[in-house]
Amino acid sequence: GTGGGKTTTFMIPNIEYALACGTSFISTDSKGDLLRLYGKLCEQYGYTCLNINFRTPMKSDSYNYMQLINLYIDMWRDDPKRVDYHSRAERYAKALANSIVHTKGFDGGGQNSYFYDSSEGLITSIILLVAQYCKPEERHIVSVFKILLEFVQTVKSANDETDSQRKVKQTKLNEILSLLPEDDKIRWFAGSVPGSEGMQYLSVITTSMSRLLAFIDSESENILCKNSKITVADIYQKKVAVFITFPEEDATKHVLVSLFLSQIINEAIVYADERTKENKLTRRLYIFADEFGIFPYMGNILGMFGASRSRNIIIVPCIQSPAQLRQTYGADGETIIRDCCQTVIFGGFSPMSDTAVTFSKLLGNQTVAAGSVSTNNREGRSLFGSGSNSSRSVNMIARPLMTPDELQLLPFGKWVVNRRGSHPFIANMPRYDKWGIRLEAPYISETREYVPTAYAKLDDVIRTIKERKWRQTVREKRESANPSESVDSTADY
């Protein structure tokens, strides 16, 4: 519960342990206490400290949510035969678009589900378009919004010049997709949107733009539009501490946190499967997800919980109530997440909380002796006279191991630990200073200099596509004329 002491009795000692062991970790924090207390100590331990601060963006390091997509697109262009690189970029683009559309409170769209499904495909398409055809400094999520904004405009098709009676308007989206090869996945992800007309077309575009509004913030662009000083692979190979600070009162920033965690966990699983001998990270990765219950829906999070532990990735979700998971992921999703948790630590319940009843049932029952004493009096005799007759019976009954009242009365620093394969017990987890942990001067983040953001322009994208298409045509003609001539294999598309 709120004020139960998660940070001072659990998070800080565990981060201290992670630093001593040399393991990388990621922590989320709504107040910024963990960064303030442990920033300097991380540097003393030889860690690279990444500060993602959505509460004070001008004091934050940068992290481009398209960084992984851009990376795999570049790797594919350098080696076009590695189709798996392009496939991975497509997968991350789809995951990013899915998380953007399925933000907290999304109920599937109801009767408007067509527009939301189309928006998801369109956002995926534009993400790949920006990653593949924009300049390096323009490849970020805000450029996706700007491209969509330009798509609202229309252009006249060439048919207008020959048939003045039949005015056919071609959208900017249709114009740019028509320049791409027929089998280009950018065209496929867009689906039926390019062929839509009038209000239907505008509805899909505006729906897509509305889901991207969380990224439109002049201060947050300082984070979202620049590449990070570390790569995702650094987190698994080196000693890296990532502190994510977010305002719990601003729901638009919650989706940014969930997107970050989703990308890191997904890439960690792929890295463990493809680049390690035993299919698990050689350096353990801890993810301390404080306030996990208020984060929006994270795509494939149920699969991540099931697959992460065997890859040496330990996810530690901290929630206020299981009802938070039920609200975001449904009853089945809540059950799956709970079943994947091998160790459960709970305590600090509010006096008005019904959650104590749930965890009391989780602990199970114990067998105790219960009895009764009855006294029968003969007529005319006193209660304690020789005529009294008393009987005593003892029965064995089931009693909760800890009743809800007993759970609510647990003092500060006392937590119930229920671990797989062992009996539950009450652990004494005092405040961190009682452990002998001494924290020195607080870590103070410096204010970063504002750097203007470069945005993609649709005309530049069209020009780039035409130039690459022309180079591809020239190359094909040269190959057909001189089949034995060696040709650069760099992909133009």
Model-derived segments and their meaning:
Residues 1-313, 328, 339, 405-426, ...:
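P-loop NTPase motor domains
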Residues 305-416:
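Conserved ATP-driven motor cores of ASCE-family P-loop NTPases powering translocation/secretion/packaging/pilus
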